[in-house]
Regions:
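HAD-like aspartate-dependent phosphatase fold
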Residues: 1-108
Length: 108
């Protein structure tokens, strides 16, 4: 997958300043960055704990922001083919999540 990079991005607290299950204001700077990223031929995965109607609402909210995804809560088909399985963990180059932390930051 050298021809493009993959970002998996969270919804609540990352793309959308929300109080689950309500929808809130967009993180406009991040959304603009991700639209540009995808316009350059890279891939985006929406990676969220939302399911059912809450997930449908989040996807519609993203479309209203002109933000489209190559996959939602799933690996890209080419990744599944490359590895021969569909791991529960999303395979990507970068994870963007308001609850993420680098290993060095946990103080071990």
């Amino acid at each position: 997958m050298d021809e493009y990079k993959i970002i998996a991005v969270d919804f609540d607290g990352t793309l959308c300043y929300s109080d689950w299950p309500a929808l809130g204001d967009p993180n406009e700077r991040l959304i603009a960055y991700l639209r540009n990223w995808r316009d350059q031929g890279n891939k985006l995965i929406l990676w969220t704990c939302r399911a059912g109607k809450a997930l449908e609402d989040a996807i519609a909210w993203c479309r209203d922001q002109k933000l489209e995804f190559d996959a939602v809560n799933d690996n890209l088909p080419e990744i599944v083919e490359m590895y021969g399985n569909n791991s529960r963990k999303i395979s990507c180059d970068y994870y963007i999540d308001d609850r993420s932390v680098l290993p060095e930051a946990v103080g071990y």
